[in-house]
């Protein structure tokens, strides 16, 4: 799904770095996966993949399964990790992350 945007080796390394529960940090993940240096168009493509229900927002349930977008066998985020991730990205307080909020969080 991320072919042409993210390198498989970067995805593998990023997932390995947060394999244990409680170790996911979005900033570290976005850096390791190589997303920070990508164009706005590529970041928008990644957002579109993560937005499973195509609502133009990433909601809490989609964030919980965030890592599984990159590898089907990846773990779900813990409730605490999900809450921290949502709080970091939800700048307008509506309980979900839009594409502009996601891009701002990636560029962090």
From Swiss-Prot:
GO terms for cellular component: cytoplasm. Residues 38-73, 77-108 form the EF-hand domain. PANTHER family: PARVALBUMIN (PTHR11653:SF12), PARVALBUMIN ALPHA (PTHR11653). The modification N-acetylalanine is found at residue 1. Belongs to the parvalbumin family. Pfam families: EF-hand_7. Keywords: Acetylation, Allergen, Calcium, Metal-binding, Muscle protein, Repeat. GO terms for molecular function: calcium ion binding. Ca(2+) 2 binds at residues 90, 92, 94, 96, 101. Ca(2+) 1 binds at residues 51, 53, 55, 57, 59, 62. Signal peptide: none annotated. This is Parvalbumin beta 1. The keyword Metal-binding applies. Is regarded as an important allergen. In muscle, parvalbumin is thought to be involved in relaxation after contraction. It binds two calcium ions.
